[in-house]
UniProtKB/Swiss-Prot annotation:
Compositional bias per record (Low complexity), positions renumbered to this chain: 77-151
Biological processes annotated in GO: nucleotide-excision repair; proteasome-mediated ubiquitin-dependent protein catabolic process
Subcellular locations according to the entry: Nucleus; Cytoplasm
InterPro entries the UniProt entry points to: Rad23, STI1_HS-bd, UBA, UBA-like_sf, Ubiquitin-like_dom, Ubiquitin-like_domsf, XPC-bd, XPC-bd_sf
Residues annotated as domain UBA: 161-201, 297-338
Protein name: UV excision repair protein RAD23 homolog
Single annotated GO MF: damaged DNA binding
GO cellular component annotations of the record: cytosol; nucleoplasm; phagocytic vesicle
Keyword rRNA processing recorded: no
Organism: Dictyostelium discoideum (Social amoeba)
Lineage: Eukaryota, Amoebozoa, Evosea, Eumycetozoa, Dictyostelia
Function: May play a role both in proteasomal degradation of misfolded proteins and DNA repair.
DNA damage listed as a keyword: yes
Family stated for the protein in its record: Belongs to the RAD23 family.
Pfam families cross-referenced by the UniProt entry: UBA, ubiquitin, XPC-binding
Length: 342
């Protein structure tokens, strides 16, 4: 069978393989031919993330279709600073160090639409472990860092069609729907975190059996459920903070969930109305339909890659990108699935 691979740089790789080839074997083949690390590859076909153990023919891949390949490099672990010691450290220590050697920059050409691929790997900073660990937890004050690793750290605001697409993508990977719904709720609809829960099999029991029904139903009464909350003190603080820096939404929601989980649930279930409230209360004298969103250089590059990959307009890509919690792979999957539906 003919398998066409398309990456975000519009490069196309074509392979002639047997239908019983597994996805993992295809990733290894891509690695051999085009030097792409298999563990960094995410393959998507018809809005589904391909599982390593399944065969290509099980996904009914056609000769005219193509597989989207996303490359996601692992995040670098920040260097750990040893606690100050009152005695000088010996010249030799048994503390392990971890280093990663950068791979050479290869040049490869694809079968069709020949182009050049130059993947590079940045060495991981050395992680020095102190000889005597301090059992007392410490909090770092480094800007941009966070002291929590809770799976509820981020929110993708998925709702309605977007949420159902996310649920379908995950259930298609073989997980039970009720477990998927529970994992998504626990992670504020963050698909990547939810999958981590599902893979580990350690999903905390739901506190409220009606929560999953509320997630599916969309919740909220009236045209805009936030009209009654317009003067709520928590909501006003949230609105002011987000208007200044939208990137702090996940952290604020996590804190707000401790004091007003009902409000957070309404925000998750009604993201469009939530955004319209910002637009309606925008800068005086400005366009009431205009909302300025600040993005980092990395986020801007991801949005541009998604535009080039899908051919969709920038506003559509941005909306999907933030709805998917800035997950580039999930955004690509959602955009392709939306395009197929239309």
């Amino acid at each position: 069978m003919k398998v066409t691979i398309k990456n975000i740089n519009k490069e196309i790789y074509v392979f002639e393989v047997n239908g019983d080839l597994t996805v993992a074997e295809l990733k290894n083949l891509i690695s051999e031919k085009h030097n792409q690390t298999p563990s960094w590859q995410t393959l998507i076909y018809s809005g589904k993330i391909l599982e390593d153990k399944r065969t290509l023919e099980s996904y009914n891949i056609t000769d005219s279709g193509f597989i989207v390949m996303m490359i996601k490099k692992p995040r670098e672990a920040p260097a750990t600073t040893p606690a100050p010691s009152t005695t000088p450290a010996p010249s030799t220590t048994s503390a392990p160090t971890t280093t990663t050697t950068a791979e050479p920059t290869p040049t490869t050409s694809s079968t069709n639409n020949t182009s050049t691929t130059t993947p590079t790997s940045v060495p991981t900073p050395t992680n020095n472990t102190p000889a005597t660990p301090n059992p007392t937890p410490t909090t770092s004050s480094t800007p941009g860092s966070t002291s929590t690793t809770s799976p509820q750290q981020s929110s993708d605001f998925a709702t309605g069609t977007e949420l159902e697409a996310t649920i379908k993508n995950i259930t298609d990977m073989g997980f039970a729907r009720d477990q998927v719904l529970r994992a998504l709720r626990l992670t504020f609809n963050n698909a990547e975190r939810a999958i981590e829960y599902l893979v580990s099999g350690n999903i905390p029991a739901a506190n409220d059996p009606e929560d999953e029904e509320e997630m599916e139903g969309g919740g909220g009464s009236g045209d805009n459920p936030f009209e009654a909350l317009r003067n709520h003190p928590h909501f006003n603080l949230l609105r002011e903070a987000i208007s200044k820096n939208p990137s702090i939404i996940p952290g604020i929601l996590q804190q707000l969930a401790q004091t007003n989980p009902a409000l957070v649930r309404q925000i998750q279930e009604n993201p469009n109305e939530f955004i319209r409230l910002f637009q309606g209360d925008g800068n005086p004298g400005g366009n009431p339909g205009q909302f300025t969103l600040q993005v980092t250089q990395e986020e801007s590059e991801a949005i541009q890659r998604l535009q080039a990959l899908t051919g969709m307009d920038k506003s559509t890509v941005i909306e999907a990108y933030f709805a998917c919690d800035k997950n580039e792979e999930l955004t690509a999957s959602y955009l392709f699935e939306t395009a197929d539906d239309e």
